[in-house]
Amino acid sequence: MSQKILFIDRDGTLIEEPKSDFQIDTLEKLRFEKDAIPTLLKLKKFGFKFVMVSNQDGLGTPSFPKENFEIAHEKMLDILKSCGIEFQDIFICPHFENENCACRKPKTAMLEEYIKHELYDKEQSFVIGDRESDMILASNLGVRGLKYGELSWKEIENEILSSFRSASYQRTTKETDIKVKVCLNGGKVSIKTGIDFFDHMLEQIAVHGGIGLEISCKGDLEIDEHHSVEDVALALGACIKKALGDKIGIARYGFALPMDECLASCAMDFCNRPHLVYKAKFKKSHLGALSTEMIEHFFYSLSYAMGVSLHLKVKGKNDHHKAEGLFKAFAKALKMAVKIESENLASSKGVI
C-alpha cells in the first residue's frame, strides 16, 4: 500500500552540520535545526511516515569511525523518539563521492524496495534536504523536493500542508460552468456565483469553517437560480470529499450550536452514507435573489456529494439570521469533523 512519506536528509536538514569537518561524531556537535521537531510532529498528525536518507562520507574509516558516528546518531534517535518521532527506515551511504557507488544520493539504490513495490504515494510524498543532490533525488523518485535553507521548517510545513488536504474540481453542464478550489487547512476566499446573498452564505462556510474556498460559477440565471445553487453544492461537496482523501486521522463527527437571536444546530458524520434531516421554516420566499426553498436543496445536494449524514435545524424570527445560522452551524461542524485528531481511521470497519 502506498504511503505518504517524507524522505528526510539528516545533516544540515534535521540536525546542524558543523562547517569545520562536516561530521557529527560527538554529543557536543548534536544540535537540532530550528522547528524541525515541531514540524515533524505536526506532519505526523496528518499521516506522514518518515524515512531518513543520508550520505555519510567515509563512515567506518579511520577519518570517521563508526562508533563515534553512532554515539551522536543514537542520541538523536532517542531524543526524537521521546518526542514521538520515529523513522520507518534509515538509509545511510558510507561511501565517498569518488567511489561512484550505486547507493549515494541522488542515486536511488538505497530506496529500491520503495520504488519496486510502490511503497510511497508520489502525489503526497516529498524529499526534504539542504543540498542539490536531495532535489535530484526527489526528481529521481518522482516526488517534489523541498530545499531546507531556502525554506525554513515552518515554511516546509506550510508548503506540504497547502498541497495536502486541498483539491480542485470543475463541473460543466449545459446550464452551468463551475470551478471550485478547497484547502481544508485555510487559505484564500473568493466566491462569485452571480447570486449575492448566496455568495454571502458560502463565505460563512469558509470563514467559520477555517478553510480556503474559491468558487466561480457561470449559470443560467436568466432562467432562475436553481441550476447554479444545485450545481455549486454538488461541485463543493465533491471537492471537499476529494480534499479529504483517505480520511485517515479525521475526527469524522462534527456538532455545532451557534446562537444569536436564533438557534441553529448542525450534526455531521462523514460516514459515506448520505442523508439529510432538515428543519427550517422561512417567512420570505427569497433572501436577495436566493429562493429560501433552495437552501434545503443546497444542503441536500451538498450532503450527497460529500457523502455525509447531515442534520440541520434552526429556530428564530429573522429569516436572514436563520439562513446565516444554518451556514455557520454547518461550517463549525465541518471544521470539527475534518480536524486531524489521530493517525487512525475513525471506523471499526477500516473504511469510511
Curated annotation (Swiss-Prot):
Where's the active site on this chain?
A: D9, D11
Which region ranges are annotated with the description Histidinol-phosphatase? 1-164
GO MF terms listed in the record are: histidinol-phosphatase activity; imidazoleglycerol-phosphate dehydratase activity; metal ion binding
Q: What is this protein called?
A: Histidine biosynthesis bifunctional protein HisB
The record ties this protein, via Pfam families, to: IGPD (PF00475), PNK3P (PF08645)
Gene from which the chain derives: hisB
Q: What is its main location?
A: cytoplasm
Query: CDD domains, alphabetically?
Result: HAD_HisB-N, IGPD
Q: In which pathway does it act?
A: Amino-acid biosynthesis; L-histidine biosynthesis; L-histidine from 5-phospho-alpha-D-ribose 1-diphosphate: step 6/9; Amino-acid biosynthesis; L-histidine biosynthesis; L-histidine from 5-phospho-alpha-D-ribose 1-diphosphate: step 8/9
